Amino acid sequence: LGLVAAGLYRTNPNDTILPPSNVSLFSDVSTVGFYMLGIRGTHIFPQDKYRTDYTVYFYSFPCDYWGMGYDMGNDDSNKSEMKRWQARIKGSFLFHLGSNFYIGPMVSYDYVIGKNVERPELLNGMDRHTWNLGAGFSAVYDSRDVLTYPHQGLYINLTQCFRPRFMGNDYAFSTTELQVDAYQEVWKGAILAEDFRTMLNFGNPSWGMMALLGNSNSMRGYYEGRYRDKHKIEAQVELRQHIWKRNSLTVWVGAGTVFSKFSNIRSRHILPNYGLGYRWEFKKNVNVRIDYGFGKAGQSGFLFSINEAF
């Protein structure tokens, strides 16, 4: 059973030029023991002087685990079970520098527990209970016309988070994340959207903080975490076509890979991704999203969410 809710609002209702802030609430409960509750959004202050991006969620679910590295995830015999519990609090406060540029501090807290681990040797001796506290900065360029359903513009987000040992982290490492999105209207009712993203972990990340392929935003259709390593690179292109009234359809193609260091990148390790989706306009510029994604060797998955994947 899933529940999603979303809202748009302006901190100054009289300023029609100010982009609307957005907030999304999401939750899931299943009969197999999965539950999740979270909230995320962007709060834009009057005159767009500041912005706050935030994500808070926790979940618990029985999951499959293959180990770390492309080769481990690619081997079906490594599939094992565990119960994973995770909580995350992540936020940034950005100052508007002008000309669509924003920069400011960010903080992140993660707490991960692995219970009932069927094959503990796949954790490579790492603790089953880990937590990480980090701080850093985010630099953003954002010329999108609408944050939740862009028709045109460019979005670039570079985030650097440090998790040093003196902050109490048992696993000390730093994370560099880059996301680049572009949007163009190609014909009547059609939007072409491109997305590139990478996560690079330098140091000693725990099994629960590795870069994971597969989620509701990228590499849709892959089991999240089957392919995990210190680093990942992903890219996708999506065509969004309005059909009739509140109804739209999408198709996408993409690819991604995980690796422990750049010298280990191999063309044969690049994983394909493609799929199609349906959009129902819940309210202006807010879509309910249903996607079905496909991956390597028959891997596939159904996703239900709010707002676009990127």
Residue ranges and their predicted role:
Residues 1, 18-31, 37-39, 154-166, ...:
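Transmembrane beta-strand segments that form the barrel wall of outer-membrane beta-barrel proteins
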Residues 1-127, 131, 213, 228-229, ...:
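Gram-negative/organellar outer-membrane beta-barrel architecture
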Residues 5, 23-27, 52-56, 103-107, ...:
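Membrane-embedded beta-strand positions of outer-membrane beta-barrel proteins
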Residues 10-12, 46-48, 96-100, 144, ...:
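Outer-membrane beta-barrel channels and translocator barrels
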Residues 36, 84-88, 132-136, 153, ...:
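Transmembrane beta-barrel architecture of outer-membrane proteins
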Residues 135-243:
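C-terminal outer-membrane beta-barrel translocator/porin domains of Gram-negative envelope proteins
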Residues 136-139, 276-282, 299-310:
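Outer-membrane beta-barrel "beta-signal"
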Residues 240-272:
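C-terminal hydrophobic structural anchor segments
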